[in-house]
Swiss-Prot record:
It comes from Oleidesulfovibrio alaskensis (strain ATCC BAA-1058 / DSM 17464 / G20). The keyword Iron-sulfur does not apply. One of its GO terms (biological process) is translation. Binds together with bS18 to 16S ribosomal RNA. The gene is rpsF. Keywords: Ribonucleoprotein, Ribosomal protein, RNA-binding, rRNA-binding. CDD domains: bS6. Belongs to the bacterial ribosomal protein bS6 family. One of its GO terms (cellular component) is ribosome. This is Small ribosomal subunit protein bS6. Signal peptide: none annotated.
Amino acid sequence: MRKFETLLLLSPELGSQPREDLLAVLTGVIEREQGSVLAVDHWGMRDLAYPVRKHMRGYYVRLEYAVAGPSVAELERIIRITDGIYKFVTVKLADEAEEAA
């Protein structure tokens, strides 16, 4: 399994409960694909440099997880069709062996 990190920009109009429900769906997808969620960091409401869907603020969340590579495509598919997620970016984190070198 590889480690990945996904940064999500959520709608500022989502309340705390719908936001938690949305994150529960995403963590459920990771666990369904035999992965594990390592960290969920709520960065909170931040100002944006430019308008995104006519909003100048957005709520940021960082997900760190370990999952098989092909399973990331399924997670990104779910993210794309989910209302309330404006933007996202996924990166593969370096393995511990690569970090030590």
